[in-house]
């Protein structure tokens, strides 16, 4: 029963899954989604629903809905039916349909009497309206424009179509889904309308009901049609606005329009009659139309930015027979013919492509300049063009098919009706395909084996390696075309070259011989039915010897003598080069098809015009080029000329003025950028901004353009995100008392930021309007004249005249002196000062500022110097520092501290007067104080007397009162019990004293009257009293009842009362806490005093220690002075600043714990942290790594938890308690399916070269003691050193060394990712990854650290890596010095002080003596595992903590030494030549100690040679540099420029080469320099600048430390001064990224037991590809017990060229006949075969030692990932899929699984 139930349940699940995945359900779902893409067609539908009523209204509704549904149905059918899709999908058809219809509709609704209706009846008119409604809904549904920014929902159906087999069913189901969604939407709209009608609040609106607005409402209802049409028109205009209009766009001038000489016409290329059919890097049809005429200088042969075309001639009937013998005339005649053809072609072009060319150039494509060639390549989107092509021998849809091929194929089909291709059956195609590839494989195998045999025969390597041919266009300098543009390296379908002899030699016989030959390419594949098998056999029959090829190509100038190649070897080379394939010459069948073809050009997709940006035009960098208009929009900027030097001071200027404009040379200019956001973003002029990718403007006022990816990082508006946490933080911050000061500072900062923003806005508004700067500039000048010469003199006159009237002395001289001191300096818009008289250039258009120096303020009187006291003087100096002695003038005549700032408050004229008055009033008060005190004393005496009199009167009055009481008691008569009544009344009245005050008063009066009545009171009066008491009681009861009712109604406390109560409670608690604090504050103060006293006494105790230290230092300095008398040693002494207290701080810092966040937990980080831990601690982690690092906190020991938390690896307190999985299961399964990759353990071990296995046992490694010394290595080093060049770019010209550093860096990346084993063996990996260390050890001599390398957990020897590719940290060099340090256990700073001083005679080592530190590294056993991962940085870090200034960050990256040998005998002026030894050259320090010692004393041979022939040395240097930098744009611009200083040349060289770093100024220095520039510009123009210079230094505007900078400052000095800072740029280097990807996949290839070190087998290998022989000989010398094995190459396949290598590997990898492993697109784990494993299984295979593979590399790691995973270019036969992704493959059709 249970089984039956489970069976039913399983069937149900599978049934449900099938239903969900069925075409109908998916179609319904996607169709339903398309309803949400609301377009303007919904406007018509809604209008028909909302507005129309009655019979006509219902008809309109019906017609609207039918039209709407019909339109949508047509759209769905167009997905399936191709012609309809083409008709509706093309943008020009939609535009042509939309524009006239929109205009018609607009005029129809806006003009009532537009049509003369005449005698039409009402029914006819109504029917016409209904038809119009139907048409509106139908047509607008077809228009493919959307209100929403993306129409993704509508396109989902199109996307899913490619995965469906039953397409028609899918289309119908999606339409039904859309219909359901539409019905639901319309029902919802109807419900909303009903709700509006029924809702009284909306209907009974005051405005609608009032008579005043009834007319407006009716008018609105009548003109609804017009409003709808206006809305519709706006949306359609918005849509059309996204397309650039073909008439008004800005056309850029191509280089062909600039004109040219005869030479230009000779080399110019013409437009091909057919599209470029050899598209390689994703060309488009629009690239065909772009032609470029190559401009050639008279001297040079060909520029770098030339465009080369490889031509293929089919026959030569067009060439005239009667051509003249002259070459130039013949060429011109030839091109005339071509031009005529092009003229006819222009008429053949359809009108549509001219007007509606949606792929025109002025679409927003970026113009990114290429460093290699100036005319840039088009940077376009990749093509997604679907067409059938052969893949794996069968026809499949390729989505990267070249569109030009498919269009050409369709053109052929249309033009030639008889052209049909018989479809061969798929089996035959696949057999052909597999046969061809098998044959290819066999041929490649043969070639490969032949080359390996040649290796065994010890041929030279140059003959064995397969060479790639490059296109060389400068033989002298060996300059090549870049690989991208090289026609020889550009794929199978490139154009083939067949050279003609010169035109005059063409004869009839030549034609007869050559008429049957033609070349085969992809076009022939489309046109011909070729028996491929037969054709492949005929290739080999062709006799290559008959071929003769010219050496020179057609685009070079013709040589005088024709050189022909007849040798067999050269013909073979050219055969390989051009890949010539020809049919049999007897076969004449092919000629008929090609009789009309003349030539086909292969064009590089470049821009046909050379654009410059506006910024380049401003900078004037295109001085060499023809002056041209900028074509690229840059950020708004203006060129502000700061200083013009009309008289040249140096002789150098006279040399430089040749062929250059002297005015431009002698002026200094700054570029002023606009502060507003840059919406241009290097856009080309004429292109549309709205279609710029990755730009979204989503706000009304947006400061910057943002990509939609980063929306979550922008501070959004309130309704976008409600940040509760931020609010909570703000509330807490406000309530905290401690943060009051911080808040105040923050407020100030915010205020300053707001002020700055406001200033920038004002500046931009002035800059944006047309004539604003002219108006502002003229107003400022007027204001300055008014202020200086009218207002201020008037004020002086008025003041002094008033003083004279008040009988005061006038102050004419003082005021006039201050007035003359005020200066009005004209400044640029940025505030750079010029002078009083000189206006900045173009100040009316660019803007002006007027700066007032020492502004004049009117004072009521001037104090004499003697009057001012010492206190006043001090106050004056402090005020001076705070107050700036300058201001800027505004348009309104006010003063501001900064340009466009808020107006400053002037010191008031009347303020000192009021102050003086206050002082005098104070004096008067003090005088009157004595009089007041006397009056006060008298008043007190008088009050005392009055008090005594008062007391006496009161006593007498009381005495009389008592006597009267006694008399009344004697005459008293008892009446009832009046006392009781009285008491009762009093008690009751006390309860409600507030309510019944009147009653109490009456009662008291009654009582008194009763007390004082005589006994002769009548009974009537008593009765009246009793009645009165009763009434009062009744009244009291009523009042009490009312009071109860009131209290019951008010039992609920109000919100205000609650607040009052809570505030009372808070106040009470606060009082309580306050008293407690006061009580306990005494103890706290005591504790503070104790701590202070303790610290004080500790300081006193440490005093003798510090004094001893100082004493030792002083003695040491005296000894140094005594010993080292030389100046250089004296300089070194000055730089030995040591602080030893930092060692104590270091200990404190090390004790601090750092808490890590879980977000930083990556796999590399985890293993990096684990690698820093001591080995003994790994015993704790045994349980952790048992279960693949997947643990929950319940089963882990507390000790392990604590350990993890301390190391910052894991936090168990956090919610997410799972580790990241360190293995990649998906890739594992995929690799398991490739069963041929499975190798046993010993095979894995033997995959590495056995020559270089290093025994890790001490017993097996026997060192030869005679070779341990360094003498032999020193000689080698010295020999190597002699070979080194001594120019600026020497360190840059060593590609082998750089390659080595590259691989070490890549290896580190691999190690950090690749460690997944339990024992954390960081050395796991393939043999390829353990390379390069042997040569590293050989070069850097790190053998002193060899004791620690037997540690099995971390193979740290490999991990020496460089931060940069091209720059070297100084290696550990100083191994020769025989001096040992006395005490090895002393502190590091003591070691640094004991560094040897020898060998540094002529070299400035400003920061650190690396030699001694290197010696320590060699003799230093690493016990601190904190730096276990990077042991080379251990000493660096410790010394850096002690001496923070010693090793700045730049010295961990670069080490500069300056070799300055100034010889004054050689003058610079001869030929403008600077000898190399006089240059302050930038060098990367890479010397041995022996060379260091001899550097200052002995001249090396290389230097001597250079001194003998300085010019030849410089030529060699220039040649070397040009080889590396010939293709860079910067060199092109600067090669004609002579540098004024060495630093400029150094910076230029540095920045061109080291693109991994950017240089930036120190931020403080930047501001200082700008301030100095502003002051310099003013001082240069003044005759007596002393006063202003002193005042600017006082104000801190001009910093004197910058004035001390030398004129010719070298780059190294600028670095050392801290002026320039090196910052690493995060560049994405493709090679490194790929290597990391390969090695992540390589994780799954690692065998479990591969690298476990056992007792029997303890060998590891460290391999260097480049220096194999040298390192083998070295290690054979060093070790006695080595066996010799001959291995020639690390990877034998590297013999082949990369293309052949890839082809060979692919062909071997896939079994073409059996097809066992076929499914490369399905999920990875589908094809895992049970009998093959890669990981963790079949350990018995490890014992098999018979069939071991001797190849030293494995197939998989050397593959490029994209080529193996995708097989893009070769396997799928596609042309544009470089960046092939797995997602794209998975989206479309899969391969069938057999």
Swiss-Prot record:
One of its GO terms (biological process) is protein transport. The chain crosses the membrane at residues 19-39, 68-88, 91-111, 133-153, 176-196, 227-247. Pfam families: Ycf1. It is found in: Plastid, Chloroplast inner membrane. The keyword Cytoplasm does not apply. The keyword Membrane applies. Coiled coil: none annotated. It comes from the Eukaryota. Its main location: plastid. Keywords: Chloroplast, Membrane, Plastid, Plastid inner membrane, Protein transport, Transmembrane, Transmembrane helix, Transport. GO terms for cellular component: chloroplast inner membrane. It is a multi-pass membrane protein. There is a partial copy of the N-terminus (positions 1-343) of ycf1 in the inverted repeat (BAF49986). Part of the Tic complex. Involved in protein precursor import into chloroplasts. May be part of an intermediate translocation complex acting as a protein-conducting channel at the inner envelope. Belongs to the TIC214 family. This is Protein TIC 214.
């Amino acid at each position: 029963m249970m089984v039956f139930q489970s069976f039913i349940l399983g069937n149900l699940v599978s049934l449900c899954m099938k239903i969900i995945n069925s075409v109908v359900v998916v179609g319904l779902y996607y169709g339903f989604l398309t309803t949400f893409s609301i377009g303007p067609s919904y406007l018509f539908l809604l209008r028909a629903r909302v507005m129309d009523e009655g019979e006509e209204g219902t008809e309109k509704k019906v017609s609207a809905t039918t039209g709407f549904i019909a339109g949508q149905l047509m759209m769905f059918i167009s997905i399936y039916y191709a012609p309809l899709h083409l008709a509706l999908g093309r943008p020009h058809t939609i535009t042509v349909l939309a524009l006239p219809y929109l205009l018609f509709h607009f005029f129809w609704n806006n003009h009532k009497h537009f049509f003369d209706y005449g005698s039409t009846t009402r029914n006819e008119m109504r029917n016409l309206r209904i038809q119009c409604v139907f048409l509106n809904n139908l047509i607008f549904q077809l228009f493919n424009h959307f209100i929403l920014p993306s129409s993704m929902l509508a396109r989902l159906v199109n996307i899913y179509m490619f995965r469906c087999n039953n397409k028609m069913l899918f289309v119908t189901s999606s339409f039904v889904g859309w219909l359901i969604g539409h019905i639901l939407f319309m029902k919802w709209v109807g419900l909303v309308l009903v709700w509006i009608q029924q809702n009284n609040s909306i209907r009974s609106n005051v405005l609608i009901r009032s008579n005043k607005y009834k007319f407006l409402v009716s008018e609105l209802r009548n003109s609804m049609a017009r409003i709808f049409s206006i809305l519709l028109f706006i949306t359609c205009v918005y849509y059309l606005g996204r397309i650039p209009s073909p008439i008004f766009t800005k056309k850029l001038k191509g280089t062909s329009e600039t004109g040219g000489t005869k030479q230009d016409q000779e080399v110019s290329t013409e437009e091909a009659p057919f599209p470029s059919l050899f598209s390689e890097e994703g060309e488009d049809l629009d690239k065909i139309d772009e032609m470029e005429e190559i401009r050639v200088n008279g001297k040079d042969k060909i520029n770098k930015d030339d465009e080369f075309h490889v031509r293929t001639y089919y026959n030569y009937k067009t060439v005239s027979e009667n051509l003249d013998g002259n070459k130039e005339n013949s060429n011109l005649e030839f091109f005339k013919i071509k031009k005529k053809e092009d003229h006819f072609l222009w008429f053949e072009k359809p009108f549509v492509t001219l007007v509606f060319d949606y792929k025109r150039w002025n679409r927003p494509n970026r113009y990114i300049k290429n460093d290699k060639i100036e005319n840039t390549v088009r940077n376009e989107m990749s093509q997604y063009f679907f067409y059938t092509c052969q893949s794996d021998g069968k026809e499949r849809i390729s989505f990267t098919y070249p569109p030009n091929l498919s269009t050409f194929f369709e053109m052929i089909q249309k033009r030639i009706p008889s052209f049909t291709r018989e479809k061969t059956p798929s089996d035959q195609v696949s057999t052909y395909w597999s046969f061809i590839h098998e044959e290819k494989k066999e041929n490649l195998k043969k070639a490969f084996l032949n080359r390996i045999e040649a290796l065994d025969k010890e041929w030279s390597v140059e003959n064995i390696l397969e060479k790639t041919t490059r296109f060389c266009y400068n033989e002298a300098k060996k300059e090549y075309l870049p690989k991208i543009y090289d026609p020889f390296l550009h794929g199978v379908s490139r154009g083939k070259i067949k050279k003609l002899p010169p035109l005059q030699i063409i004869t009839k016989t030549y034609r007869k011989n050559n008429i049957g030959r033609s070349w085969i390419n992809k076009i022939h594949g489309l046109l011909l039915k070729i028996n491929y098998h037969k054709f492949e056999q005929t290739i080999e029959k062709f006799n290559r010897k008959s071929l003769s090829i010219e050496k020179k190509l057609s685009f070079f100038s013709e040589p005088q003598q024709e050189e022909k190649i007849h040798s067999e070897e050269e013909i073979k080379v050219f055969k390989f080069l051009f890949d010539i394939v020809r049919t049999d010459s007897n076969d004449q069948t092919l000629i008929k098809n090609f009789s009309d073809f003349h030539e086909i050009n292969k064009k590089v997709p470049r821009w046909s015009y050379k654009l410059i940006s506006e910024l380049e035009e401003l900078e004037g960098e295109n001085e060499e080029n023809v002056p041209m208009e900028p074509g690229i929009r840059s950020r708004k900027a203006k060129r502000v000329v700061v200083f013009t030097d009309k008289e040249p001071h140096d002789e150098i200027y006279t040399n430089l003025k040749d062929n250059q404009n002297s005015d431009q040379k002698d002026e200094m200019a700054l570029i002023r950028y606009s502060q507003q956001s840059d919406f241009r973003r290097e856009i080309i002029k004429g292109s549309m901004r709205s279609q710029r990718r990755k730009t979204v403007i989503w706000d009304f006022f947006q400061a910057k353009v943002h990509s939609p990816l980063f929306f979550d990082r922008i501070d959004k508006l309130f309704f976008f995100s409600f940040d509760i946490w931020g609010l909570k933080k703000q509330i807490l911050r406000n309530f905290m008392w401690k943060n009051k000061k911080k808040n105040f500072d923050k407020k100030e900062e915010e205020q300053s930021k707001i002020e700055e923003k406001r200033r920038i806005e004002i500046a931009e508004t002035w800059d944006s309007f047309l004539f604003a700067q002219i108006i502002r500039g003229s107003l400022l000048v007027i204001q300055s004249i008014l202020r200086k010469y009218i207002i201020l003199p008037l004020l002086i006159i008025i003041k002094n005249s008033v003083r004279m009237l008040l009988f005061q002395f006038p102050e004419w001289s003082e005021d006039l002196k201050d007035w003359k001191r005020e200066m009005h300096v004209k400044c640029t818009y940025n505030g750079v000062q010029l002078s009083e008289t000189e206006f900045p250039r173009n100040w009316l258009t660019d803007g002006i500022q007027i700066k007032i120096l020492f502004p004049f303020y009117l004072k009521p009187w001037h104090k004499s110097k003697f009057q001012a006291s010492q206190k006043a003087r001090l106050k004056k100096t402090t005020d001076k520092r705070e107050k700036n002695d300058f201001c800027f003038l505004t348009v309104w005549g006010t003063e501001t501290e900064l340009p466009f700032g808020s107006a400053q408050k002037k010191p008031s004229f009347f303020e000192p007067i009021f102050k003086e008055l206050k002082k005098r009033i104070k004096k008067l008060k003090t005088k009157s104080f004595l009089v007041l005190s006397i009056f006060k004393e008298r008043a007190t005496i008088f009050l005392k007397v009055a008090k005594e009199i008062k007391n006496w009167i009161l006593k007498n009055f009381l005495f009389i009162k008592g006597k009267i009481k006694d008399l009344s008691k004697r005459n008293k008569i008892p009446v009832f019990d009046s006392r009781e009544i009285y008491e009762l009344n009093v008690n009751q009245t006390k309860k409600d004293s507030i309510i019944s005050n009147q009653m109490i008063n009456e009662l008291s009066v009654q009582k008194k009257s009763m007390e004082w009545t005589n006994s002769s009171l009548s009974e009537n009066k008593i009765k009246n009293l009793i009645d009165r008491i009763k009434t009062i009681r009744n009244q009291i009861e009523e009042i009490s009842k009312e009071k109860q009712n009131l209290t019951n109604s008010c039992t609920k406390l109000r919100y205000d009362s609650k607040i009052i109560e809570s505030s009372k409670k808070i106040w009470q608690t606060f009082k309580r806490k306050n008293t407690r604090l006061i009580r306990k504050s005494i103890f706290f103060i005591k504790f503070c005093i104790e701590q202070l006293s303790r610290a004080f006494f500790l300081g006193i105790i440490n005093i003798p220690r510090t004094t001893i230290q100082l004493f030792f230092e002083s003695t040491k300095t005296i000894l140094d002075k005594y010993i080292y008398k030389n100046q250089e040693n004296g300089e070194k002494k000055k730089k030995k600043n040591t602080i030893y207290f930092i060692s104590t701080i270091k200990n404190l810092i090390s004790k601090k714990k750092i808490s890590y966040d879980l977000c930083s937990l990556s796999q590399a980080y985890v293993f990096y942290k684990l690698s820093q831990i001591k080995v003994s601690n790994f015993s704790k982690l045994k349980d952790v790594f048992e279960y693949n690092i997947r643990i929950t906190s319940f089963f882990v020991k507390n000790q392990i938890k604590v350990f993890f938390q301390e190391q910052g690896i894991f936090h168990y307190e956090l919610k997410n308690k799972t580790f990241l999985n360190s293995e990649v299961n998906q890739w594992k399964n995929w690799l398991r399916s490739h069963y041929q990759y499975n190798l046993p353990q010993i095979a894995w071990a033997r995959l590495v070269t056995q020559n270089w296995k290093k025994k890790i046992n001490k017993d097996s490694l026997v060192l030869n003691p005679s070779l341990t010394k360094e003498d032999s290595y020193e000689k080698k080093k010295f020999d190597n050193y002699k070979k080194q060049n001594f120019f600026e770019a020497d360190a840059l010209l060593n590609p082998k060394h750089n390659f080595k550093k590259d691989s070490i860096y890549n290896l580190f990346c691999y190690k950090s990712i690749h460690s997944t084993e339990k024992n954390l063996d960081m050395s796991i990996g393939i043999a390829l990854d353990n390379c390069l260390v042997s040569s590293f050890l050989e070069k850097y001599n790190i053998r002193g650290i060899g004791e620690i390398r037997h540690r099995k957990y971390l193979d740290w020897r490999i991990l020496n890596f460089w931060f940069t590719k091209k720059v070297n940290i100084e290696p550990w060099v100083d191994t020769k010095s025989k001096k040992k340090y006395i005490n090895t256990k002393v502190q590091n700073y003591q070691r640094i002080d004991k560094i040897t001083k020898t060998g540094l005679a002529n070299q400035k080592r400003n920061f650190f003596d690396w030699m001694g530190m290197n010696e320590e590294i060699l003799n230093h056993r690493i016990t601190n595992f904190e730096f276990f991962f990077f042991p080379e940085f251990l000493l660096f870090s410790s010394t850096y903590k002690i001496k923070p200034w010693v090793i700045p960050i730049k010295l961990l990256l670069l080490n500069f030494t300056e070799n300055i040998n100034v010889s004054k005998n050689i003058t610079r002026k001869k030929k403008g030549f600077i000898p190399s030894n006089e240059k302050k050259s930038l060098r990367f320090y890479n010397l041995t100690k022996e060379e260091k010692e001899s550097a200052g004393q002995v001249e090396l041979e290389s230097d001597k040679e250079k001194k003998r022939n300085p010019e030849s040395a410089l030529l060699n240097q220039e040649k070397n540099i040009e080889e590396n930098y010939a293709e860079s744009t910067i060199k092109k611009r600067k090669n004609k420029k002579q540098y004024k200083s060495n630093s400029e040349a150094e910076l230029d060289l540095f920045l061109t080469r080291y693109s991994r770093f950017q240089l930036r100024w120190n931020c403080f220095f930047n501001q200082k320099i700008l301030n100095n520039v502003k002051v310099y510009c003013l001082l240069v123009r003044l005759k007596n600048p002393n006063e202003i210079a002193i005042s600017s230094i006082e104000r801190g505007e001009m910093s004197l430390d910058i004035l001390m900078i030398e004129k010719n400052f070298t780059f190294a000095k600028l670095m050392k001064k801290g002026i320039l800072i090196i910052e690493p740029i995060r560049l994405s280097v493709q090679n490194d990224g790929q290597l990391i990807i390969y090695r992540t996949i390589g994780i799954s290839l690692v065998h479990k037991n591969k690298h476990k070190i056992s007792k029997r087998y303890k060998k590891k290998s460290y391999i260097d590809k480049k220096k194999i022989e040298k390192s083998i000989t070295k290690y054979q010398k060093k070790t006695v017990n080595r066996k010799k094995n001959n291995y020639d190459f690390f990877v034998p396949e590297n013999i082949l060229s990369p293309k052949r290598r890839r082809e060979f590997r692919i062909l071997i990898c896939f079994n073409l006949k059996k097809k066992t492993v076929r499914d490369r697109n399905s999920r990875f784990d589908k094809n895992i075969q049970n009998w093959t494993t890669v990981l963790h299984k079949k350990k018995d295979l490890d014992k098999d030692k018979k069939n071991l593979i001797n190849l030293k590399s494995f197939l998989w790691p050397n593959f490029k990932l994209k080529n193996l995973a995708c097989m893009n270019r070769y396997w799928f036969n596609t042309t544009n899929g470089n960046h092939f992704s797995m997602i794209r493959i998975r989206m479309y059709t899969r391969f069938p699984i057999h």
